Amino acid sequence: MCVSSSPTNTNRTLELPVSIDVVKLAKGEHKTDEFLRVNKFGQVPVLVERDYANDDDDSMRFVLTESSAILKYLSETFSRTVSASKMYAENEHDLKEKAKIWSAMDWYQTTIRSSAAGLSWHAFVAQNMGGALSLELSKHYEGRLKLSLDVLETKWLGDSSPFLNEKPHPSIADLLVVEDIVNLVVLKGSPFRSQLSSLEELLRTRPRIRKWIDAVSRLNRPAWDELHRVLEMAAATAEKKMNSVRGQSSFSSGSRSRAGSRL
């Protein structure tokens, strides 16, 4: 069984026996014939479960797309493992408990996910994918995100437990939702960063979300730190590049001014 893209972070955190294939979107690997044979939508994430006795026969593969569906499937598949035993439902036969988790995951898709992804794309990611950045759209999605974060802070999180639905332990919903928020660290590398709220600013007035992120990160701190080190590096690289361009621009402008004064 292998998974491409998120929810690979969940797999790493829980140390599930799943192999992870990295798909380089910036190089268009998700649009190659090889990838499209696996996922005709040409998108990530995708889970592939192979029958290795018939690995050359595509019909013997089980393919699943969409983060929520993949996480639910993995939770059911590995429900008896120590790391995942309570990440779905404390009682694997308790449909109502599972439904509460589904509810949080479904809410996230049209709120946190859509707004955070839109903000990240228009403020940072698009420039690495051959697209154009947009301050106007970045601000639009930032406004939507703030409203969604307020709902997360006041409705989904409480004081009796740091986790969603005030459950005594985390679930796959926590792992799914938290990623799109902490991934906003990439905004440090946006050319619009002075005109947008940073991740720290977004969380400053939302103490429950801060407590929740900290609790989720402690599930497997080494894995968490390694995952987010990559995001920090991407943001730092972009920021360094922007500063270099600004420096060259300032030098060029200064040279023209001095030349003009001599005429």
Segment roles from a protein language model:
Residues 1-136, 251-252, 258-263:
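GST-like domain detector, emphasizing the conserved glutathione-binding G-site
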Residues 41, 158-159, 219:
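Structured helix-beta-strand junction loops
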Residues 82-90, 116-118, 162-166, 194, ...:
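Short, hydrophobic secondary-structure boundary micro-motifs
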Residues 96, 100, 104-211:
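GST-like fold's C-terminal all-alpha helical module
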Residues 168, 174-263:
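Fungal C-terminal region signature
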